[in-house]
Amino acid sequence: MDPLWKQYNENKGYIYQNNISLYLLVDIKTAAKKTHNVLGEILHHYKPMLSYVVSDSLIQGAVTIILSGNKPDIEDIKNIEERFVFMDGRLSDVGKNISNIIMPIISMDWLDHFTWSGLGHMPDKELIILNEIVQKVHLENKQIRFWASPDNKRGWNILENVGVDLINTDKLNQFSTHKFQN
């Protein structure tokens, strides 16, 4: 958190100079409740920089912490008076009336739904399914991301064209060049 805090202070309240918020996904691999409690203690010190919820009201910050992996129960999260974390959901969470101030993102394993690897044309049937999933998530005003999606220009183009909000990549330089060329 300290490097983000330094950047936040250098940019007068933002991580990026263009005032775009940053999502920091924390993939919990340990005991959910215990980890969440420790995180809460740590994150409180960075409150001016963070998005948080107080009495069901969202205070948007420069950094939004999203818990993924072994997450605490939604009911445990809901009942916290001042909360510095949000939940990463799954497609199975769509349609359950989970508020965006609890679960702003739906994440999915690409390989659970698609066979296309980013080479050649994406099969029409898979493109239709992809569009339907994105629309379903967007109807709840949530953002969508896939992990293990095709990590190349063709894959990025498809994801951008259908409206995927957050694109995972291990090729940061190539993706950055791709984004600024388009």
Question: What are the language-model segments listed below?
Answer:
Residues 1-182:
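Catalytic cores of phosphodiester-bond hydrolases, prominently lipid phosphodiesterases
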